Amino acid sequence: MEALAAAAEQELDSLQSRGVRMVGNAFSPIVLVKGELNDREKAGGRLLAGADGDALKAALLAMGYAPEDFCGLAAVAGPADDGSPSSVIEGAPLPSDLFREVLEALDPEAVVLLDDASVAVMQGAYAEELAGIEDFDTAMLTPGLVAHVLGRRVLALGGFEAALSDAHSKQRVWAYLKQLPPEGAPY
């Protein structure tokens, strides 16, 4: 078991050295992807450390996820420090192949796309799989519709952080989120 944990840690360290920004538990069953960073996050602050992260943690707890079931992933690149030439540009969307590598390494049961920028990165990374979904709106990752991609439930919220300032929008994203209870939940 220690060998598996060490291998996972090494893989995650490698991803972070190539510009991937993550926060939380890499073994979480749910990954929250944010592409439209706020000013604090753009300046190097911790991802999802503000009101949006607090609201997401509270929502996940209310839905039955454990407190440690929180993993945030930026859909835009942070600084790369592996010393090799890279196609990763800090502040730009993660390249499709790198985003896909990260998501496959994390291997969550569910993926929540918090904004349009994260939807665009997901669409690029999983274009072939999304094209195989019969319903057009689901394949386009329309907010509120759950898409099944390689056995994962994928849900776009359509601007989570902005929704926090409006009561009606908050209710809408809460209704969307309730479609992703933990696997095996009794409800």
Map each language-model feature to its residues.
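A polyanion-binding, active-site-adjacent surface
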Residues: 1-187
